Amino acid sequence: ADIWSRAGASPDQLYCELGPGRGTLAKDALRSMARFGLSPQVHFVEGSPVLRALQAEAVPGAQFHEDVASLPEDRPLLLVANEFFDALPVRQLVRTDAGWRERMIGLDDGGLDDAGQGEDAFRFVAGDQPMDSAVPEGWADQPPGTIIETCPAAAAVMGEIARRLAEQGGVALIVDYGHLRHRTGSTLQAVAQHR
């Protein structure tokens, strides 16, 4: 609301949230904005039908999008992304004696039986295609076995956000976790029921 006031308090704003979870942050933000006389159109970028149902309950009238690119382009954005980028898929690269390769899941030599079972049936393998051009600057000469992660989707989404802000005006508040510098190692983990 403060930024909206400083920008001239235009009534034509879009509140856009990327990955709004259950809609709680949006509901709270909209309640605060209303105290300043701001009632923007609400647009959520969310792919999960289950979460869309919860968000529609929390913020009736919200419009849903699969992608940032489909958001309206006719007015300034108030864009919020809370832990959105953390949820995007990563691509793992592993340094081999032959250079950088994508780290993939493959079958052990024993493979699977007819029922799809097998002891230690899956393992990480290095892909066949060179991936040296996907390695961030300054990381090419790491020792074999080094793993790094990249997120091509993050760059694409951020590029679209930047383009929209430059053309439409507005502001983005992005809250995410990360490191100032690239780190090596795998962050992949399996999570079920928040464990």
Q: Which residues fall in each region the model found?
A:
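Class I S-adenosyl-L-methionine
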Residues: 72-195
